Amino acid sequence: MITITITLGVNYLRPNSWPSHYDSVVLITSIGCKSSPTQTVGTVIGKDLIVTVAHGVAGQTSTSITTVSGQVLNAKVVAIDINLDLALIYVDSAKSTTKLLPLKFGDAVAGSETRFVAFEDSQQFAISAKIKEILRIVTEDIYLKNKISRPGLKIKTRVVVGNSGGPLINHKSEIVGLVWATSRTEKNLAWATRIEATDKLLALISSRNPQSATPQVVACSG
């Protein structure tokens, strides 16, 4: 499988139409343990909390986000799960000139159309992503050492390197999953983790003071 990056956000336009962009989806840049910066995508899911993929931030010494308006804000990893390939990042949203409103969780529906949100050349895009199947995905942890099982989604959309963490957003502007890999053998086939898997990480931190959390120390991935 090939990893990918995605972005999400919320910006309502007219009824019965998909938003042109999502303010709640941000670009994440991490540095410290690789020869070049690692970029992934994150989505605001709580006050000052962003969810993304673990393999992009694991072992890094510095992380920041870039909003759709181009503003860069410092961020901090507060929880990480190397088996689910998920991480929570804290950012002081009060400093953002863009409203970073949390997206609600939604249930994935097989056969439904969603929007996959990510970035290309620092510009956010949102494209069609159809949910083909809801399943358990047998894969490996982010270090490719141990076999694990994740609540997953098989989706049809175009994903490239750097899109990892990009959300799948339904017509209600709810997040239903995070893309983390694309197929090496079938064109426009990708894999996502269902958003309810994030509940395990959310239970580890304080909703009132998330920045106080200290995640487990993990090595660089990839």
What does each model-identified segment do?
Residues 37, 48-126, 208-209:
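Conserved active-site neighborhood of the chymotrypsin/trypsin-like protease fold
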Residues 43-45, 76-78, 132, 160:
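Conserved positions in beta-strands of structured domains
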Residues 12-15, 25-47, 53, 71-74, ...:
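A conserved glycine-rich beta-strand in the N-terminal activation segment of trypsin-fold
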Residues 21-29, 92-100, 125-208, 214-215:
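Active-site region of chymotrypsin-like
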Residues 33-34, 121-122, 185:
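Short glycine/acidic-enriched loop and turn motifs that connect beta-strands
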Residues 82-85, 186, 221:
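Short acidic/glycine-enriched loop/turn segments that link adjacent beta-strands
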Residues 1-19, 208-222:
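N-terminal targeting leaders that route proteins to membranes or the secretory/organellar pathways
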